UniProtKB/Swiss-Prot annotation:
Lineage: Eukaryota, Metazoa, Ecdysozoa, Arthropoda, Hexapoda
Major localisation: secreted
Native source organism of the sequence: Mythimna unipuncta (Armyworm moth)
Keyword terms, alphabetized: Protease inhibitor, Secreted, Serine protease inhibitor
Protein name: Trypsin inhibitor
Tissues expressing this chain: Hemolymph.
């Protein structure tokens, strides 16, 4: 399973591509 750091990085990158 991915580490919490990897999950956090993914969420940050997702925010860049799909900003609220």
């Amino acid at each position: 399973a991915p580490s919490d750091t990897t999950i956090a990085e993914t969420l940050t990158i997702t925010e860049e591509f799909f900003p609220d």
